[in-house]
Amino acid sequence: MSLRFIYGRAGSGKSQFCIESINTRIEKGGDKPLILIVPEQFSFQSEKNILDLIGEKSINRVKVISFKRLAYRIFDEVGGIAREHMNSSGKSMLFYHIMNTLKSEFRVFALSARQKGFVNTIADTVSEFKKYELTTEVLRDTIDEIEDEELKNKLHDLSLIYDEFNRLLYKNYIDPDDDLTILKDKIKQSTVLQGAEIWLDEFSSFIPQQYGIIEELLKKCSRVNITLTMDYDNASKDNDIFSVTQNTEKRLLKLAENNNISIEKPINLNGRPFYRFKNSPELSFLEKNLYSFPYEIYKKGPDKIEIFKTSNLYTEVEKIARNIIEFVREDNVRFSDIAVVTGDLGSYEKTVSVIFKEYRIPFFIDRNKDIEDNTLIILIKSIIDIFVKNWSYETVFRYLKTGFADIEPDEIDILENYVLAAGIKGKKKWTEEEWTYNVYGDALEGDISEESKEKLSKVNEIKNRFLRPILNFRERVLRRNNVAEICRALFEFLYDINVPEAVEKMVNEFRESGRQILANEYSQIWNIIIELMDQLVEVMGNEKVNLEQFSRILFIGIKEHKMGLIPSSLDQVLVGSIDRLKSHAIKILYIIGVNDGVFPSAAMEEGILSDRDREILNSKGVELAKDTKTQAMEQRFLVYTAITNSKEYLFLSYPIADYEGKTLRPSLIVNRVKTLFPKIVEKSDVIKIENDEESMKLISATVPTFNEMISSFRKEIDGEGEVSSIWHDVYRWYSKSDEWTGKCNNMFKAISYTNQVDYISEEKALKLYGGSLKMSVSRLEKYIECPFSYYVQYGLNIKDRKIFSLTPPDLGSFMHKVIDRFCETIKEENIDWNEVNDHICEEKIYKIVDQEIEGRGGSILNSSPRYSYIALRLKRILKRTVRIVAEQFKRGSFKPVGYEVSFENGGSYPPITVGLNDGSEVVLTGRIDRIDMMEKDGSTYIRIVDYKSGNKIFKLSDVYYGFDIQLLLYLNAILENENLDEEDKVLPGAILYFTMDDPIIKGKNNLTDEQIREEIMKSLKMKGLLLSDPDVIKEMDREMEGSSIIIPASIKKDGTLGRSSAATKEQFDILIEHVRNLVVKNCENLLMGDIRIKPYKKGKEKPCDYCMYSSICRFDTMFDGNNYRYVKEKSDEEVWKLIEREMSEEGDERGED
């Protein structure tokens, strides 16, 4: 029985020495076992290395195992485990249960127990206790010796948890963390190990459990060989980096001494050329000097070491992919000879996956996969969340879109569109016998068409099919209220919807399509779920819980579970984390993300027990895991072992920015390598160089090369430089390929693509809009704002997905309807506006609003308390509106003669007809809220009032550009169509906007009711354009003194007009003429097919800000031909001068005097 150390720095050949020693023992003969113990992640590669050397001879004599697998072998021989292991998921669920049970007894963990992730922190701490052989008895004894009150309280709580965990666990299970502790005692009984020779390789340190096993092996076996990555004499220039293994050596020597184990002369592999670096002196030099002080300088320019700086993570991985293709293609390297590692696999995993697939590089990402994103797990979470979250939209459709429900994808779309439009959410609405909500009119419309009824029938059929298994599950759960019963109900539900058969079908489909990793994942997932629930039932099956509590416990376990993945082939690039880098024959090593805080990683969090806590416990003889300072030293050692892992080539790369554009700094390792190799040239893609040589480097796999070709041609077209002739050769290759010919044709279409559409043919325009153009005035205004937006909305009839909500147009429509009904009511009841008071306003408005809501079965305004409040708010606004309207009538002589006046065939007035220059006509329709009239001195004055739910501001400048032409067109139509006696004169009185609102008045607290009323009227003053006749203006507000509080006008003391928004009769005439010219011009453009993306921009105002079609047009001033139609805000004076000049020039053209 002896102990022998095998010393050697990284790459010295320690693993190879072990394998050759085993082979020597085999050749000498004998039957004693030869056992190589390695960390779990190295076992496969080590076994392969041994097979490569010794073949299949005496293979039964050699065992390559980890400590865990050694435990299982000994248990198989001598017994020791009569119960099943509880996995990490089961333990997390158990800890959660314990934390909830004991929370009233905690001294410090009561609040922390609720924090996300705290259960896992507790689980890790208890696992640490077991690995470091800290029993509950020792923990309790230690508490009495601790003076630090905070630590004493922590240990008190941990002791409670630890005790309860062991008590509950050992009823039916055993903790995998106890295996090595049990193994230590069972080795004594083993005959398999008697006289065996052991080699321990690839360990830098051991935990107490492992030291205990090594101690027993030393007593049992003929020899124990242990490799240590360090110098032989402990006097090297970089002892600091080997402090971890030096401490391991000291502890092993002490252990041998305590057991009277002889120490053999060690093997020193540092004195000969390093095995790994026999073909690479540069890498050998790097290994010797990476952490040496003082250090040497490599005088030549290195060929086997490269540093690359990239713009971002994406271009970094692209560079590596091209480099890998080059090695495989030109240097006869196998993919399995290559490894790509990083200190931050999470940030790179998806990018590597996407780019390597594009470059057709076979790869295996070495990591344990979370199962949370598996479709079956999402299904289970969704079905529970449907009830926990009261049938929310998100949970229901997350369930449906897993693909396990008996609903086809197009049926899910139908159901989803209806649910969004009708605002279906909550158990009550989902479980209604039949849905009858109208989703095809506006949000406040209640009538249902025949077409709507047919669609509703289909929606209800889909809904009922979805509900059947869901409601069955609900009934089962309602009858069961403990963990075991809920688990049983959940399994019954999964069988009801045929999940096992569906999963099996998915596995077969994945295998047939070559997606082996997904096939492996889904072939495991069903058994994982069964195991999870079995453990949950065994541990706390009789616990009474509701669904929410059950879900929380179950998904704590699910989050903890990791699924091991198996490589689908041998010839793959290994992609992984530096701490799992397997020591196999890596010829080419890429270390990516060599950034500060990543390589080496930043300091780890202290956890529940701080560094100070660990120091105190250590002083009491309690050994625990390393503090953060020691962990930092281990990180340095990890960097050393990673960077020296390659046999032939080392590539270090780092991005200067992350995915969000935030600056990243290079690691100190980069600067260290530059210092050791002063002639190394750091390459970069930050500043791209365009020449034939660089272009050649971009030619790799077909897909990325094609993309690079497109990029090069695009740059040439954009005037960013001449394309290399190489890309013309590349194009010729692709164009001759049957697979790529079509793509080449599409490429030039894409390169020359512009989102600008200019014109469609007049023929298409006629088909879209009809031979004689008929449209509403508001639509014409939309066309003037942006032709393309009009084309998409009214030509193509593209509509946004309807969502159950109350939009401003919905509110405006509803308010107009109520105002119209109020006006008709007082007219029918012969109530004069002068008699309308607060009581009448409130009584009738409230009644009309209630009737409108009740008469619309699916009205949004009675769908929830929130919308009921909006309805109440609408009542107040509308009451205030009609009260102000009444006050306006009382103060003036104008009287209403029409409400909701329409301009259309069969309407109050005929449609507005405008002749175009080619002899055709455009027919404009529309509706105005109110027309008022007043007769004075033999003339009739017309006042048009339009109600607005938003704060509409009248600007003459907007009329000039065509953005606000409705009121003038309606006024013109009325003036032309009024049937009055020939001697009477019909004149424009005003065009006005009136805002419907219930404003909040800011002012002093001692305002009288009359003052408040006046302030409200000022706030709701009508805006628009008046006839500049003081007598007519006074008839609109007989009480005005100076400035009016109801119209935009003021009268001076001498009776003349002061500051007012007014125009003469002649100005009204030329303004109307200007508007009619705008109609002609824009309608002709429309019929000519002008659908250009040409939005206007006035200052900061532009229609794109509220346009729902921006994702279609993708307007961007960076694109060629994408320009705003800039319009300048003009003063009223400027507008009048421009219009008068235009009318004068037009008259000159017609030869008028």
From Swiss-Prot:
Q: Tell me which SUPFAM superfamilies the record gives.
A: P-loop containing nucleoside triphosphate hydrolases
What InterPro entries does the record tag this protein with?
A: ADDB_N, DNA_helicase_suAddB, DNA_helicase_UvrD-like_C, P-loop_NTPase, PDDEXK-like_dom_sf, PDDEXK_AddAB-type
Which of the seven top EC classes does this enzyme belong to? hydrolase
* Gene Ontology molecular function: any one: 5'-3' exonuclease activity
List the Pfam families hit by this protein, alphabetically. Answer: ADDB_N, PDDEXK_1, UvrD_C
Cofactor, how bound (note): Binds 1 [4Fe-4S] cluster.
Which cofactors does it use?
Mg(2+); [4Fe-4S] cluster
Origin: domain of life? Bacteria
Question: Does this UniProt record's set of keywords contain Iron?
Answer: yes
Q: Name one GO biological process term.
A: double-strand break repair via homologous recombination
Please provide the record's keywords in A-Z order. Answer: 4Fe-4S, ATP-binding, DNA damage, DNA repair, DNA-binding, Exonuclease, Helicase, Hydrolase, Iron, Iron-sulfur, Metal-binding, Nuclease, Nucleotide-binding
Residues that bind [4Fe-4S] cluster = 786, 1104, 1107, 1113
Q: What is its EC number?
A: 3.1.-.-
What does the entry list as the binding residues for ATP? 8-15
More about this protein: Despite having conserved helicase domains, this subunit does not have helicase activity.
Which PANTHER family does this UniProt record tie to the protein?
Answer: RECBCD ENZYME SUBUNIT RECC (PTHR30591:SF1)
HAMAP family according to UniProt? AddB_type1
Chain's role: The heterodimer acts as both an ATP-dependent DNA helicase and an ATP-dependent, dual-direction single-stranded exonuclease. Recognizes the chi site generating a DNA molecule suitable for the initiation of homologous recombination. The AddB subunit has 5' -> 3' nuclease activity but not helicase activity.
Please describe the quaternary structure of this protein.
Heterodimer of AddA and AddB.
The family classification in the record reads: Belongs to the helicase family. AddB/RexB type 1 subfamily.
Question: Which NCBIfam families does this one have?
Answer: addB_Gpos
Which protein are we looking at?
ATP-dependent helicase/deoxyribonuclease subunit B
According to the entry, what is the taxonomic lineage of the organism? Bacteria, Bacillati, Bacillota, Clostridia, Eubacteriales
Q: Which gene carries the instructions for this protein? A: addB
